[in-house]
Amino acid sequence: MNKIYRSLILTVSIISITVANPKKGNWKQFDYTSGISSNYIFDVEKDSQSRVWVSTQNGITLIDGNKIKKYGLSHGLPPTNIIKVVSIDNVIYAATSNKGIYYLDDNDMFQKADFIQGDKVYTMNAVGSKLFISTKLENVLYDGQKISFMGNGFPNTKIRDVFIDRDKTVFVGDQEIIVKKGNKYVSEKIKFDKKKVKIKNFFSFKGVDYFGTNKGLWSRTKNESLALISKADVLSLDHDK
């Protein structure tokens, strides 16, 4: 299949994680009974060493070949949902739903980061060599040393997702997408024909834009209006490259 859409209906998280060897086609499922911190999974990240980091409602799990390690309260993580995990420049960052950002130090312990304002985090993504973070108070980039603000035209809004394809970066708000044109950011309001639709994720492929929302999966081409593909509550939208 060229495209894989991962979506769940009327739920808030993934139930388990399944991994495979693409050449052999062998799938293996990991859940709580096999060592994952929780069956409620929010994000999965593969680092530069091909290790898999799984963020859950009850900490983070590291899958390193046949070895599994759980990170939780005893490793410095707070008792709350870990909504995103990102590996950048060999540092693991963990975003929580309401306790800010944490990073894994050289002693294999998570420490709370002091480089952002606001404990409520909406999303955290790698954008080039920098870490993009959207909180209740700000949208910023972190380069490992210092914070920079997004700059001219970037709205003060909640960012739910970031889509990156080559030199194109799309920041996704509840009802808008934001792109950089020239030296400034431009927002586009997305108009759905249903009420109370909130965008959760975005993907663009071969001239078609896909919007994963709380009211279904929508698509559009350049000269056409939005079309509803599925009524599912889409939590993740991805592509099998």
Task: State the predicted function of each range.
Residues 1-241:
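Carboxylate-rich, polar loop motifs that coordinate divalent cations or form catalytic acidic clusters
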